[in-house]
A protein has these predicted regions:
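Active-site microenvironment for binding and transforming phosphate-containing groups
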Residues: 1-153
């Protein structure tokens, strides 16, 4: 299972993958992310060209981010290009407006998604949605990380 995460700050965002470390300079993308409300926003990246985020994006920001994902998938792809979305929220990821918009675009392009946040601690919960699987990672300061992978394609 390829799973990675990196926190987004005003400087570089670091993401680790199974066999690759990706260094993203978040300042390059600050023109379409509302940095004032990006607390808790995550960017993920891995060696087969998957990258995603959820944050408070405007409609223009969603369009720019969609183009950004396409470009990075082209640049990083050493296998079949795929999208990835990661969310950090106390609510279901598909209920986030920006994420829902991106998912809707991807569904029109033939991608399939399923699942939602289940259980977990309200302090911190992460959901990674892939085109062919769903990984649910729940963690809190008091418990170990529990991961559940659901293949549905």
């Amino acid at each position: 299972m390829i799973y990675c995460r990196g926190s987004v700050e005003t400087g570089p965002a670091y993401a680790t993958a199974t066999n690759k470390i990706v260094n993203l300079d978040f300042r390059r993308y600050s023109n379409f992310v509302d940095t004032d409300s990006a607390v808790g926003c995550l960017i993920i990246a891995c060696s087969n060209g998957i990258l995603g985020t959820y944050s408070h994006l405007s409609q223009e920001g969603i369009t720019k981010f969609d183009e950004f994902l396409l470009q990075l998938n082209k640049e990083w792809s050493d296998s079949k290009p795929r999208y990835g979305l990661v969310g950090m929220s106390k609510t279901t990821i598909l209920h986030e407006p920006s994420t829902s918009s991106i998912v809707a675009k991807m569904r029109r392009s033939g991608y399939t998604f399923s699942g939602e946040v289940v259980g977990g601690d309200s302090v911190q919960r992460k959901v990674v949605m892939w085109a062919d699987r769903l990984v649910i990672s729940e963690s809190s300061p008091l418990t170990k990380v529990v991961e559940k992978e659901v293949n549905f394609l």
